[in-house]
Amino acid sequence: MPKSPATQRLKPRKLPVQARSAHTVEAVLEAAARILETQGLAACTTNAIAERAGVSVGSLYQYFPNRDALTVALIERETAQLLADVERAGQGETSHGRILDMVRASVAHQMRRPVLARLIDFEEKRLPLGDRDQRVADTIHAQLTGALQLPDAPRLADRELAAYDLLAIVHGMVDAAGERGELDAAALERRVMLAVGGYLNGASSA
């Protein structure tokens, strides 16, 4: 199916193939992240990003046709880190351990750079990223389902449905904490695990 014009304009013009060009793209993305953190969305223009990255605007436009395409690339960079952390969490030996590690990965993603995470959440809602959002949800859901299939997991009538519910609980609580500007990762982890534990206890006894 052909890409819609709205989706097509979010694609990079080209991908870096050499170390030098990869360094340029990373410098541009990190410059955008720093501006978002320190000055906010309004200040994050392509001119400001290029200046902060130490490259020409022309060099920036070689890779990104507009600011939205650059923002999507930044979102993808942060998402790749989250998914790598979640996949590592899915290697634990116990159901509880895997779920706890996945909660920690989600909280750490939000708290590592909280201002950036909050603004990226805002941009994710604004931009048409349906395919990306589904890909992320599917990956995390698969990891949660795997955790619920281990021998020590609670007895559940529908593990896949329970994994969707857990995904909603974790995502909702972590995003809400980010919107409130919470910074205490340990406290948030405890609250999320209480909610997850309460759900699993209730579902297994239903």
Name every feature range the model reports, one short phrase each:
Residues 1-23, 152-154, 204-206:
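N-terminal intrinsically disordered/low-complexity leader segments
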Residues 21-32, 49, 74-85:
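Generic hydrophobic, amphipathic alpha-helix propensity
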Residues 27, 31, 35-69:
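Helix-turn-helix
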Residues 28-36, 78, 82, 106, ...:
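Short hydrophobic clusters on alpha-helical segments that form packing/core surfaces
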Residues 71-78, 120, 136:
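Alpha-helical DNA-contacting segments of helix-turn-helix folds
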Residues 80-83, 97-104, 108-112, 127-153, ...:
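Amphipathic alpha-helical packing segments from all-alpha helical-bundle domains
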Residues 87-89, 120-127:
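Short linear capping/connector segments at secondary-structure termini
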Residues 146-150, 167-185, 197-206:
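Amphipathic C-terminal alpha-helical segment
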